[in-house]
Amino acid sequence: MNIIETNNLTKSYADFTAVSGINLHIPKGAVYGFLGPNGAGKSTTMKMFLGLTKPTGGSFTIDGKKYPDNRVQILKEIGSFIEAPAFYGNLSGEENLEIIRKILGLPKSSVAEALEIVGLTQFKKRLAKKYSLGMKQRLGLAGALIGKPPILILDEPTNGLDPVGIHEIRTLIRSLPEKFDCTVLVSSHLLSEIELMADTIGILNHGHLLFEGTLDQLKSGAASQGYPTDNLEDTFLALIDADNKHRGTVR
């Protein structure tokens, strides 16, 4: 069963098309790695799922509910971490999450639960402005996880972290579907992390979906075309390069 499906989903602006007729199939309970160069359309697609920008063509359903007919109900089922999360620096981590809890109408216990999931319980009283970058990323994840929504949309959750922080966040994300029966859509430029984290991947370039499937399916298809398959990064770069040449574009 797919918890998110798109049908020719498109987002066009006056001078370019950011997302061009893509058909995504995101399985329930999976970690879905969303890949592509800068400007490929990943963030735009995620923002459409969150109601932050409107599609100009096509449609999508989330948990069987069509957008925008069921917009409010859909958004209640999604936790998100888009770009660098903003916090009130003069409030503690706990107080920042309390604001989110009240907006969402969640029980008081949800704040403590979210802090525990991301490992910030012992730092909950510390002011957010005194958090390290890794702790801020964890707080952003806590904000997405609060209330344990069935769908998480995470845009570059390991951005700016050191190797230890990246490993910790990857391990956390990988554990979420099994622990909380949720689905994770995650984008990252760290292809080695997606290779370790994702069950299924989708690759975008210039708004077009080049591939969707498992890593084994990607390697099999790449090998048949003579592309390198030693690791995801080499395969990804070969696919993007071939597509750019086909379109007559250069990255």
Each predicted region: which residue ranges?
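Conserved ABC ATPase "signature" region
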Residues: E98, K102, K108-K124
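Helical segment within the ABC ATPase nucleotide-binding domain
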Residues: H167-F180
